[in-house]
A protein has these predicted regions:
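Mid-domain, small-residue-enriched loop/turn segments at the edges of structured enzyme/sensor domains
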Residues: 104, 111-112, 126-167
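Bacterial N-terminal signal peptides that target proteins for export
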Residues: 1-7
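Active-site-proximal loop and beta-strand segments within enzyme catalytic domains
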Residues: 83-110
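Extracytoplasmic
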Residues: 38-40, 62-64, 68-73, 89, ...
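Beta-lactamase-like hydrolase cores
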Residues: 19-65
Length: 167
């Protein structure tokens, strides 16, 4: 089961990297959605129903820039943690360490489901310690995830470290 998830995840990340810049069609009219939400952003949509595939993009420059994956990293990180044995399954209870944090949802025992819902950093920091940097680097390379660099001098490497992915 986990092998199929790995293959699907790897295919998703690799396919998102392989997009050729020259084949992109700019969609400036999509800016209204970001403006209405009061945010900066980019979107890349690949329509593979066509042959060859059509790639539509709003803000091509931003789409090419690399960013910290932040909370989006929970998805591959959860799979790495399961594969490494840091957590058994989505039902395992991860005991709260008792440290009061700003967000109330973090101040309780967690499962994978609640940790993902609340973006519970202490859970994922625990996984990172258990996995270790060398194994994390190997996992990242195995799915061709961004620059595959989990090094950090402070904090969570997917937030404050060197790990970068394209928008």
């Amino acid at each position: 089961m986990i092998e199929r998830v790995w293959v699907a995840l790897a295919a998703f990340f690799i396919s998102s990297i392989v997009i050729a810049r020259d084949s992109m069609i700019d969609k400036p009219e999509w800016s209204k959605h970001f403006t209405q939400a009061g945010v900066n952003g980019t979107i890349v949509v690949v329509d593979e129903r066509k042959t060859p595939a059509i790639t539509l993009v709003f803000d091509r420059e931003r789409a090419a820039r690399r960013y910290s994956p932040a909370s989006t990293y929970k998805i591959p990180h959860t799979l790495f943690a399961q594969d490494a044995g840091a957590v058994a399954d989505e039902f395992q209870v991860l005991k709260w360490d008792g440290v009061k944090r700003t967000f109330a949802g973090h101040n309780q025992d967690q499962t994978l489901r609640s940790a993902m819902r609340y973006s519970t950093l202490w859970v994922y920091e625990g996984f990172a310690r258990q996995i270790g940097e060398p194994k994390a680097r190997a996992y990242l390379r195995s799915i061709d995830y961004g620059n595959a660099d989990p090094a950090t001098s402070k904090g969570a490497y997917w937030v404050d470290g060197n790990l970068r992915i394209s928008a």
